[in-house]
Amino acid sequence: MKTIISVIMLIMMTTLSYANDIYVTQSGNALDLDITQDGENNTVGNSTTASASAGVTTILNIDQIGDSNVITYQIAGATYTGVINLVGNSNNVDLNCDAGGSNSSCGTANAVINFTGSSNDIDLDIGLTSSANTADVDIVGQSGSDSNVVAATVDGNSAILTITVNGDTNNYLIDIDGNGDANGHTLIHSHTGSIADVDIIQSGVNDNMITLTTSGDNADIDISQTD
């Protein structure tokens, strides 16, 4: 009987999944925050309680290694610079810059999101209620990144959005709007792999440019450009 109990306890111990949770609430002129989480089911904010930074300048770098991790972050500030690195599957990112507040313009934004893995859900919003004067966003899915959903919304005067993904069965929802400046908006989209669903909306009174390169079978692409 003792042997049976010992085996059951060992199985329970080896199947436990530990998770780390981080909740950030920050206000002030400047924040430089680096977060690294290694493991499964870790969170930086969640669907009900987002982490938040309200200040003039935010530098935010997050590395998550593992599966089923969550990032939910709201930034209210004039300048945002950040890099998010994901290695693993079934991760969820919801990042908003211009979440409200007296310094919420998100006037200058430079964001990079790198992911390696499958079934990830990435939602990036910059300039939700006030246009970003300058936005430079890079989203990169490394080789073998399959069945991911990437949604990027940028409202600004001069937005440059570059998306490069190597994998199959990915879905892209891209919306770039705002009046634009003399340079207009630029979207550079490169996809390698089969079964890509791409929806692009680009609007602004000045010149807009889309460079789209796709390599693979069964791509469904819809593009709408308006002044």
Predicted region positions:
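Bacterial Sec-dependent N-terminal signal peptides
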Residues: 1-9
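Sec/Tat signal peptide C-region and signal peptidase I cleavage site
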Residues: 5, 13-19
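Intrinsic disorder/low-complexity segments, especially N-terminal tails and targeting/processing regions
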Residues: 9-13, 162
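Low-complexity repeat regions of mature extracellularly deployed or surface/particle-associated proteins
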Residues: 20-227
